[in-house]
From Swiss-Prot:
Protein name per Swiss-Prot or TrEMBL: Large ribosomal subunit protein uL4
Superkingdom of source: Bacteria
Biased composition (Basic residues): 59-72
Ranges where the record places region Disordered: 46-72
GO biological process, any: translation
UniProt keyword annotations, A-Z: Ribonucleoprotein, Ribosomal protein, RNA-binding, rRNA-binding
C-alpha cells in the first residue's frame, strides 16, 4: 500500500510503502478488544479494600437474647445488616494484571494499524524531523499542519527522541510514543495519528517477523 509523505510544513514530498502484512490485513475486532481490555486491566492498582464483619471494630457480644423480646434475632453488632457493621462481599486488594498470548497481541497491533491506515484523513506520514529547541510552540506549529487539537493526537517515532517528547509534554491530549512502546488503546482512540517515516519503516520490519 502506497501512502503520501508530507514535509513538516504540510507539503507533499513523496510516497512510502506500508507493508500489506502490517497495514492492510483483515481486521480482527476481537483481538483489538482483548488487547485493550488487557492493557487497561494491567494499569489497575487494585488497592480497594473493605472490612468484613470479623475486621470491623466493636463487640462480638449478642445484643439481646434470642427469644422473648419481640425483636429480630441478631448475633453481633458487627452484622453487615447493621449500620457500622462489616461489608458483605466487598472488594479486597487483588492483582488485575494478566498476560495476553503473543499471537493475539501481535494480531491486535496489526489490526489497529490497518484500521487507522484505511483512513487517510486521520493517519498521516511525515518526514523525519527534530525539535532542537525542545519548545512546545515549535512542535505545535508542526502538528497544526496535520491535526486539530480538539481530540487525542498520537505521534509515532522511530526512536526515543527526547527533545520531541520534551516539546510535547505541555500539549493537552497529545501522546508521543516510540514504535516499540505502543499500546493498542492509544492507537485505537486517537483522533489523529501522525507517523514519522522512520516509525513506519520500523513497524514494517517489526511486525512482519
Amino acid at each position: 500500500m502506497e501512502r503520501k509523505v508530507f514535509s513538516k510544513d504540510g507539503k507533499e514530498i513523496g510516497t512510502i510503502n506500508l507493508d500489506d502484512r502490517v497495514f492492510n490485513i483483515e481486521i480482527s475486532h476481537g483481538s483489538i478488544y482483548n488487547a485493550i481490555k488487557n492493557e487497561l486491566s494491567n494499569l489497575r492498582v487494585g488497592t480497594s479494600s473493605t472490612k468484613t464483619r470479623s475486621e470491623v471494630r466493636g463487640s462480638s457480644k449478642k445484643p439481646w437474647k434470642q427469644k422473648g423480646t419481640g425483636r429480630a434475632r441478631v448475633g453481633t453488632k458487627r452484622n453487615p445488616v447493621w449500620i457500622g457493621g462489616g461489608i458483605a462481599l466487598g472488594p479486597k486488594p487483588r492483582d488485575y494484571s494478566y498476560r495476553l498470548p503473543k499471537k493475539v497481541k501481535k494480531l491486535a497491533f496489526k489490526s489497529v494499524l490497518s484500521l487507522r491506515a484505511a483512513d487517510e484523513n486521520s493517519f498521516k506520514v511525515i518526514e523525519n524531523f527534530n525539535v532542537e529547541s525542545g519548545k512546545t510552540k515549535d512542535l505545535a506549529l508542526i502538528i497544526k499542519n496535520f491535526a486539530s487539537f480538539n481530540g487525542k493526537v498520537v505521534i509515532l517515532l522511530g526512536n526515543d527522541d527526547q527533545m520531541i517528547k520534551r516539546a510535547g509534554k505541555n500539549i493537552r491530549d497529545l501522546k508521543i510514543l516510540s514504535f516499540d512502546k505502543l499500546r493498542v488503546v492509544d492507537l485505537f482512540y486517537a483522533k489523529n495519528l501522525i507517523a514519522l517515516e522512520s516509525a513506519v519503516n520500523k513497524l514494517n520490519e517489526f511486525y512482519i517477523k
